[in-house]
Amino acid sequence: MSIDINNRLYTALVTPMFVDGSIDWGSFENLLRIQEYQGCGILILGSTGEALALDFDEQCEVVRFVTNLNLNVPIMVGVGGFQLTKQLQWIEFCQTQRVDCFLVVTPLYAKPGSASQTSWFKTVLDKAERPCMLYNVPSRTGVNLAEEVLTSLKDHPNLWALKEASGDIQRCARYQELAPNLVIYSGEDGLLPELADVGVKGLVSVISNIWPEQTKEYVKQSLAHQIAITDKVIWEVATRSCFSVTNPIPVKAWLAYSGVITTNTLRAPLLANELEDLSLLIGADSLVKDWFSHI
């Protein structure tokens, strides 16, 4: 079966865990099947999936587990770190599995400049045998994706898309201007309507862990420029509820509360008790479900 990677909605999936921190495969499959049922593309081992808190063997086990389920939606795998050789080894492993595409983040911690970024991304793209989505998220990496990366690599056969999560609408528009054939996805749930106005074609979402069906409708309306201002506010509230403390703490808390996964456990350095209560999530859940009931 051919998989279309140009899904308008990808869910950046959490990695469910037992209280002892081991991966909860039963909850993981439950979460994956829910996303598959709604037709959402799936991103595993991104920051929401706590990829860097898992060792290499665990990461490989996650990829094997997910791909062996033979889901009928596209599977994207996160590529991110500091040591280039390890990222290339990771890509090499993933390409032995049924992985459809990669999410490749700007190198972490080092804050590389234009030339360094371009060299890094070219090396990764050359290694990849799958379409790649670059990822600009300066709040996590400390640096924006350099414009030179796009001007230099926009015609690379393995460069497919960009996830833009700087929160800067004009920057997103500039990236689209520099690489007009690049498919740009919003990495900011609450900004999708505004980013759609400058050419964004989809969303890589955190909140769709909780509300996959409703988020699909939100994406549909946003990309069609049909979402009302009052409705947009609802999705801004929903987004804030999932980012009141560091992601994925709130999302895991709600999924455990609602019985989708067994616990809200995270790996160090994150602790579940940073979220003091569920009041924001309870309020957002009510708003989102009421909005959807009137569609």
From Swiss-Prot:
EC number: 4.3.3.7
Predominant location category: cytoplasm
GO CC annotations on file: cytosol
InterPro entries for this protein: Aldolase_TIM, DapA, DapA-like, Schiff_base-form_aldolases_AS, Schiff_base-form_aldolases_CS
Gene: dapA
Subunit comment: Homotetramer; dimer of dimers.
GO terms for MF: 4-hydroxy-tetrahydrodipicolinate synthase activity
Name of this chain's protein: 4-hydroxy-tetrahydrodipicolinate synthase
